[in-house]
């Protein structure tokens, strides 16, 4: 699934951490989902994600 589509399912106040699935390294942290630009989100496909009860979603992309 494209990251842009995935983010449309996430609430605005959710923190997001993007990780490169292949390199296994963090790309960037965002305090709020809407801080990720459309052009950046369009570049990635979601491999899988994890979520915690504190409002953080870690998304592994390629």
Annotated model-derived regions:
Residues 1-23:
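N-terminal acidic leader/helix
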Residues 19-62:
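Detector for the mature cores of small, proteolytically processed
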């Amino acid at each position: 699934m494209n990251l842009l589509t995935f983010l449309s399912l996430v609430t605005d106040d959710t923190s997001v951490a993007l990780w490169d699935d292949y390199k296994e390294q963090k790309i960037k942290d965002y305090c709020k989902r809407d801080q990720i630009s459309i052009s950046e989100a369009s570049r990635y496909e979601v491999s899988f994600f994890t979520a915690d009860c504190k409002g953080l979603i870690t998304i592994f992309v390629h």
